[in-house]
Amino acid sequence: MAGGWPMIPLLLLTVVALAIILERFWTLRRKTVLPVGLGEEVRAWAARGNLDPTHIDSLRRTSPLGALLAAALDVRHRPRDQIRERIEDVGRHLVHRMEKFLNTLGSIAAAGPLLGLFGTVVGMIQMFLGILDSGVGDVNELAGGIGKALVCTAAGMIVAIPALFFHRYFRGRIAGYIVEMEHEAIQLLDTLDTPRAGAPVAAGGRGIVPPVSGS
């Protein structure tokens, strides 16, 4: 194998990085984190006062946004500042969950070039020890040995550059989600402060909001 045995951990890091990138792409889809119309639907539900615990639990399981809004509804009878504290606490847990595996991806981005450099150094040491034992010999063989040693450096960069790019990309996407989730939570707080009896069901509801019983 060109580059020698240090290529093995680099190949393993490549597989792990690819798996993390694909998993995070699937998990951090917008419709999975911030379902369209969910905030409006929950505000209409809260305004009507139809806050059955069963429906709150159902909301909690829909998405990270649903979990955040459900946390606010759990403590809706408390003062506004306590509701905000609950939202912030649950929000931290949700961010931690959305950032799952990103530290690993960042570590791969940092370790890839170092492993590549290590492989190159090992290859150069082996080559110069061979020269010490048998002399310079053919210059072409010397150039070939240097080229094989540098393969590790190139491989390390090939692993690290995409890992670093997607690490930053996912961090940015999560930061954007956090801003939107905070906005939806504040809007729900305002709705809880000024309940509106008989508010209509939000268009495009997904069955989370219970039907209004007739008088």
List each language-model region with its residue ranges.
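Residue-level signature of catalytic and energy-coupling elements of molecular machines
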Residues: 4, 18, 53-54, 69, ...
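Alpha-helical transmembrane segments of integral membrane proteins
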Residues: 7-20, 106-113, 159-163
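Short hydrophobic/aromatic-rich motifs at helix boundaries and adjacent loops
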Residues: 10-15, 25-26, 56, 98-101, ...
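Loop-to-transmembrane-helix entry motif
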Residues: 2-7, 94-112, 145, 149-156
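Hydrophobic membrane-targeting segments
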Residues: 1-38
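Predominantly long cytosolic amphipathic alpha-helical stalk/bundle segments
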Residues: 31-118, 122-136, 166-215
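Pore-lining and gate-forming transmembrane alpha-helices of multi-pass membrane transport proteins
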Residues: 140-171
